[in-house]
Design a protein with these regions (language model features):
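Short, conserved micro-motifs enriched in small and acidic residues
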Residues: 2-6, 43, 106
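C-terminal nucleotide
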Residues: 18-23, 30-42, 48-169
Length: 172
């Protein structure tokens, strides 16, 4: 959810404030990404860009990030399982699935891309039931890909049992 990017941004701003130096957006992104690379190895820069953006960002690999305006009257609730996950582990699991069942896994990955595109439209047009359905379907696919966790699945089940329109896992 960008916690380390937010911390890197705050620390960078604090240092520049302490030394009474002006900080350009370019410098802020440079130093915050530098910190992220130390923390994560090879960070994408997405989290730093997101925490420093006035609007949500839409990201597709190898395309420029796009700021999007939300028209959203619902609530998003974020829960933490306490389980530490690593993107690199999830990637390894999916790579293994591709080796084992290439056609099926690639279809699931493609479907996740289509669901993500739909979610963008639903967020921008306040289509909450449709967004919930997309989240549920995406979580099911991610579970079948092997990147979920029993605690996550229990939280999703609890959220849905208590009136949530949708629920899915996200990164840490």
């Amino acid at each position: 959810l960008g916690a380390t990017a937010a911390l890197a941004t705050a620390i960078t701003r604090a240092f520049f404030d302490f030394f009474e130096r002006d900080l350009t957006d370019k410098e802020l992104l440079y130093f915050a990404n530098f910190s992220e690379n130390i923390t994560h190895g090879r960070a994408s820069g997405i989290d730093v860009a997101t925490v420093n953006s006035e609007l949500p960002l839409w990201f597709i690999k190898n395309e420029p990030m796009e700021q999007i305006e939300l028209n959203f009257s619902g609530f998003l609730v974020i829960g933490d399982t306490g389980v530490h996950g690593f993107t690199s582990q999830a990637i390894s699991i999916v790579r293994e699935r591709i080796c084992e069942e290439k056609e099926k896994t690639m279809h699931q990955i493609s479907k996740l891309g289509l669901l993500a595109a739909s979610s963008k439209e639903f967020l921008m047009s306040n289509q909450l039931p449709e967004l919930g359905n997309v989240m549920n379907e995406a979580h099911d696919i991610l579970t079948h890909l092997g990147v979920s966790h029993p605690r996550l699945n229990a939280m999703v089940k609890t959220a849905l049992a208590n009136g949530a329109l949708g629920a899915k896992l996200t990164g840490s």
